[in-house]
């Protein structure tokens, strides 16, 4: 048990310190809040006048789709970059595993394109 504790003591210490700091900051922000917000403070400010329209407009779902597609292909690049650096040292299995990964992502991209997920009308 002592050996196991020695291996994970740095990680446990890091989690304990980060949890303590997070709790301390949250408690300080709660107790040092100068005053509760009134209706005037939480209202939308528009050049000193009352707002003409509701400030909370709806958000188009296509923006979320574009963000998710960006994350997927950004993740692809994060896998592709280290692979390209060690390509000369990899075996044939490492090469073909990344080719299969790229084929799957390409097929997914073609599927999204055919379904019209990339169309902005």
From Swiss-Prot:
Record's signal peptide: none
GO molecular function, one term: NADH dehydrogenase (ubiquinone) activity
Alphabetized UniProt keyword annotations: Electron transport, Membrane, Mitochondrion, NAD, Respiratory chain, Translocase, Transmembrane, Transmembrane helix, Transport, Ubiquinone
Name of the protein this chain belongs to: NADH-ubiquinone oxidoreductase chain 3
EC number assigned by the record: 7.1.1.2
Organism: Porphyra purpurea
General function of this protein: Core subunit of the mitochondrial membrane respiratory chain NADH dehydrogenase (Complex I) that is believed to belong to the minimal assembly required for catalysis. Complex I functions in the transfer of electrons from NADH to the respiratory chain. The immediate electron acceptor for the enzyme is believed to be ubiquinone.
GO cellular component, one term: mitochondrial membrane
HAMAP family to which the protein is assigned, alphabetical: NDH1_NuoA (MF_01394)
Family per record: Belongs to the complex I subunit 3 family.
Catalytic reaction list: a ubiquinone + NADH + 5 H(+)(in) = a ubiquinol + NAD(+) + 4 H(+)(out)
Gene3D superfamilies xref list: NADH:ubiquinone/plastoquinone oxidoreductase, chain 3
InterPro entries: NAD(P)H_OxRDtase_bac/plastid, NADH_UbQ/plastoQ_OxRdtase_su3, NDAH_ubi_oxred_su3_sf
Main location: mitochondrion
Segments traversing the membrane: 11-31, 63-83, 90-110
């Amino acid at each position: 048990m002592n050996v196991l504790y020695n291996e994970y003591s740095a990680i446990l210490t890091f989690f304990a310190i980060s949890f303590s700091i997070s709790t301390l900051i949250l408690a300080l922000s709660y107790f040092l809040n100068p005053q509760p917000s009134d209706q005037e403070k939480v209202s939308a400010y528009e050049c000193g006048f009352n707002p003409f329209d509701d400030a909370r407009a709806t958000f188009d779902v296509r923006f979320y789709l574009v963000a998710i597609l960006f994350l997927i292909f950004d993740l692809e690049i994060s896998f592709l970059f280290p692979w390209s650096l060690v390509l000369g040292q990899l075996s044939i299995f490492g090469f073909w595993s990344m080719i299969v990964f790229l084929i799957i992502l390409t097929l997914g991209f073609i599927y999204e394109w055919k379904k019209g997920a990339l169309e902005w009308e």
